[in-house]
Structures are given as C-alpha cells and as structure tokens.
C-alpha cells in the first residue's frame, strides 16, 4: 500500500510526496513528455473507442517497470500534480467496455492523459466524466494477471 503526504505552508506553498511500497525495485525512470506528444490508451477490444490524444501540456513524471508513458506521479507545466497510489480496495472493470460509447482508457495511461490535457482540478473532473476507465492486467508486476489496484 502506498502513502501520500502533503505539507501546506502558510505562504500557500505545497509540498507533496509519497511512498512506493512494493518491497522491491520498481525500476522508476524520469519521463519528460513535451507538448504535442501523441499518445494512446490500451484496449484489447476493437468495438470500444480507444482513446488517442495529443498533449496540450508538457509534463515530467516517474514511470515504473519500463512502461513508457505509464506515469505513477507527475507534474505538468500548469502546476497540476498527480499521484497514483496502490490501494487494494480499489475496484475498476478488469476488461474494457465492449460497446461503442465514450472513450476508453486503461488506468496505466490515465495519469499521463490527465497531466497532458488538464490544467486544473476542475478540468480533471470534467475530463473524467467523458471517459470510461478500466484496469488492464499488468503481468510484469507479479505472476498473476490480476489487475493493478490503484487510485488517484
């Protein structure tokens, strides 16, 4: 389970941090993602509309296990920060939607999409209302194909 901390000073400066409690090296790397970078979500279902986007905002973030664009924590040029935390109680669909409704994004790419397209928390709320999120299994984390229990 991960822990998130936030220190707020009287001068309105915020410091955030987190633990990444896996008990082994998650091979994090710093990713610098420029404006205009084209990205896409992962889906295994051709009926669902797979999301693709071009970043309006550049951002810097930490990835894990060598998954390119799979951001665990990051900060964009508008000052919006995000952290994905390991919370076993989190439940998301474990397969992508099969209909042709709104865009579908896997949780692995969600943080990067938010950082690349949203300037404020209100933007995030609006954006999240326009997508369906699913929890793609990530076998690289453990031998099981269980999905990754994460939370924003």
Language-model-derived ranges and their functions:
Residues 1, 8, 118-152:
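Accessory structured domains or lobes within enzymes
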Residues 1-102, 136-139:
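A contiguous strand-loop segment
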Residues 84, 88, 100-132:
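Alpha/propeptide regions of enzymes that mature by internal proteolysis
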